[in-house]
Amino acid sequence: MAAFDYNVKDLSLAEAGRHQIRLAEYEMPGLMQLREEYQQEQPLAGARITGSIHMTVQTAVLIETLVALGAQVRWASCNIFSTQDEAAAAVVVGPHGTPEDPQGVPVFAWKGETLEEYWDCVDKIFSWGDELPNMILDDGGDATMAVIRGKQFEEAGMVPPVEEGDSDEYQAFLGMLRKTLAEQPGKWTAIAESVKGVTEETTTGVHRLYHFAEEGVLPFPAMNVNDAVTKSKFDNKYGTRHSLIDGINRATDMLMGGKNVLICGYGDVGKGCAEAMAGQGARVKVTEADPINALQALMDGFPVVHVDQAIGDADIVITATGNMGIISFEQMLAMKDHAVLGNIGHFDNEIDMASLLHRDDVSRVTIKPQVDEFTLPNGKSIVVLSEGRLLNLGNATGHPSFVMSTSFADQTIAQIELFQNDGRYVNEVYRLPKILDEKVARIHVEALGGTITELTKEQAEYIGVDVAGPYKPEHYRY
């Protein structure tokens, strides 16, 4: 029996997961070098990290890096479909355990959770017995939101009732908080006071952090990892360029060459999507609300249109905005028969999934896991991937290991920075110091066999930088 609690699909999958983790380590030089650099120092000794990121093979390497640097960890996935069950099992069993005697860390994640199960897993990663977590590592902001809203509702003495129009997910979230307030009064307030900081992985979660800060309810310092250059300009673009195609291929077996594709959003993720589809020979159009991004799309050769102008001709529609209400039910009615609709933003509200799932005049047939055909009132069908959630993780396995090495090296460094500098940071949102961003880049340049030119002292003085960096001012746009 394990000396800790966990909830994963099947521990017998651990061996398969361990083989994949071992291979991923070779593709994740950032994390492996940080292990080597900090193993003796143990900079995270005493850290109790509540982690909420997609429970993939790459995340397993991150978790075991945090543990190698001294941290204790409890983990859940941040998406109901994104867990790789073999990775979750391998992390619970650990490098030296067996399915009969797990010696890893507590994980609460499996592919295909219900919304109620998902929020129960979030509750579990904050339950440390006689201790409290003192760090959060988040992706999308759900874990952080649980602490902040839980504390607010404890102060108010009640969880607000469900209102008409509340999403299924928000109803499940309120249900979890209602249960914890009844069974463990004061839990979230105590956690808010214990946590030294949160590091946030993704655009959507960062938006939430800034909103909490503006609202004046952020109870601890936050590090915006998403906007580290080695995250947003690599994971968001190059990772998506790889994983979007992987997800669509696994889901549909559709040839993309010659197809009409509509990409909604031309931020870093949208750029990766458009480039990937164009590389497959698709005819790509882009929608965009920001005129700067729209101009970039045009200069890159992609027509910029309104959704209504292009959705009727599109064979594939992908949302990548991080916003809500991008594709309405009325726009779905205008789509081609058997067109494919997917999302690669963090939440499912970019697409009006509520109408598809709850209208009486819409029927659903599951083709295979995370691939559903919805027949609309006009008789046409559309194929929806991962119920409007992240298709690259629901229909495939997410971004490749090497690009996640940059993001997760950023996360590890940010955790060390906040944990070791308790008191230096106030309850605001910070960005990773540029010198650390450059450190992560340098590791990966060397891993790919690149040679970085070293400035002479005179050259460095001429442009006003240190020979060792940082080489660009904070306002520089890469």
Swiss-Prot record:
<comment type="similarity">
    <text>Belongs to the adenosylhomocysteinase family.</text>
</comment>
<dbReference type="GO" id="GO:0004013">
    <property type="term" value="F:adenosylhomocysteinase activity"/>
</dbReference>
<keyword id="KW-0963">Cytoplasm</keyword>
<comment type="function">
    <text>May play a key role in the regulation of the intracellular concentration of adenosylhomocysteine.</text>
</comment>
<feature type="binding site">
    <location>
        <position position="231"/>
    </location>
    <ligand>
        <name>substrate</name>
    </ligand>
</feature>
<dbReference type="GO" id="GO:0006730">
    <property type="term" value="P:one-carbon metabolic process"/>
</dbReference>
<dbReference type="InterPro" id="IPR000043">
    <property type="entry name" value="Adenosylhomocysteinase-like"/>
</dbReference>
<feature type="binding site">
    <location>
        <begin position="202"/>
        <end position="204"/>
    </location>
    <ligand>
        <name>NAD(+)</name>
    </ligand>
</feature>
<feature type="binding site">
    <location>
        <position position="236"/>
    </location>
    <ligand>
        <name>NAD(+)</name>
    </ligand>
</feature>
<dbReference type="GO" id="GO:0071269">
    <property type="term" value="P:L-homocysteine biosynthetic process"/>
</dbReference>
<dbReference type="Pfam" id="PF00670">
    <property type="entry name" value="AdoHcyase_NAD"/>
</dbReference>
<dbReference type="InterPro" id="IPR036291">
    <property type="entry name" value="NAD(P)-bd_dom_sf"/>
</dbReference>
<keyword id="KW-0378">Hydrolase</keyword>
<keyword id="KW-0554">One-carbon metabolism</keyword>
<dbReference type="InterPro" id="IPR042172">
    <property type="entry name" value="Adenosylhomocyst_ase-like_sf"/>
</dbReference>
<comment type="pathway">
    <text>Amino-acid biosynthesis; L-homocysteine biosynthesis; L-homocysteine from S-adenosyl-L-homocysteine: step 1/1.</text>
</comment>
<dbReference type="GO" id="GO:0005829">
    <property type="term" value="C:cytosol"/>
</dbReference>
<protein>
    <recommendedName>
        <fullName>Adenosylhomocysteinase</fullName>
        <ecNumber>3.13.2.1</ecNumber>
    </recommendedName>
</protein>
<dbReference type="InterPro" id="IPR015878">
    <property type="entry name" value="Ado_hCys_hydrolase_NAD-bd"/>
</dbReference>
<feature type="binding site">
    <location>
        <position position="288"/>
    </location>
    <ligand>
        <name>NAD(+)</name>
    </ligand>
</feature>
<feature type="binding site">
    <location>
        <position position="323"/>
    </location>
    <ligand>
        <name>NAD(+)</name>
    </ligand>
</feature>
<keyword id="KW-0520">NAD</keyword>
<dbReference type="GO" id="GO:0033353">
    <property type="term" value="P:S-adenosylmethionine cycle"/>
</dbReference>
<feature type="binding site">
    <location>
        <position position="201"/>
    </location>
    <ligand>
        <name>substrate</name>
    </ligand>
</feature>
<feature type="binding site">
    <location>
        <position position="139"/>
    </location>
    <ligand>
        <name>substrate</name>
    </ligand>
</feature>
<feature type="binding site">
    <location>
        <begin position="344"/>
        <end position="346"/>
    </location>
    <ligand>
        <name>NAD(+)</name>
    </ligand>
</feature>
<feature type="binding site">
    <location>
        <begin position="265"/>
        <end position="270"/>
    </location>
    <ligand>
        <name>NAD(+)</name>
    </ligand>
</feature>
<dbReference type="Pfam" id="PF05221">
    <property type="entry name" value="AdoHcyase"/>
</dbReference>
<feature type="binding site">
    <location>
        <position position="235"/>
    </location>
    <ligand>
        <name>substrate</name>
    </ligand>
</feature>
<feature type="binding site">
    <location>
        <position position="56"/>
    </location>
    <ligand>
        <name>substrate</name>
    </ligand>
</feature>
<feature type="binding site">
    <location>
        <position position="392"/>
    </location>
    <ligand>
        <name>NAD(+)</name>
    </ligand>
</feature>
<dbReference type="InterPro" id="IPR020082">
    <property type="entry name" value="S-Ado-L-homoCys_hydrolase_CS"/>
</dbReference>
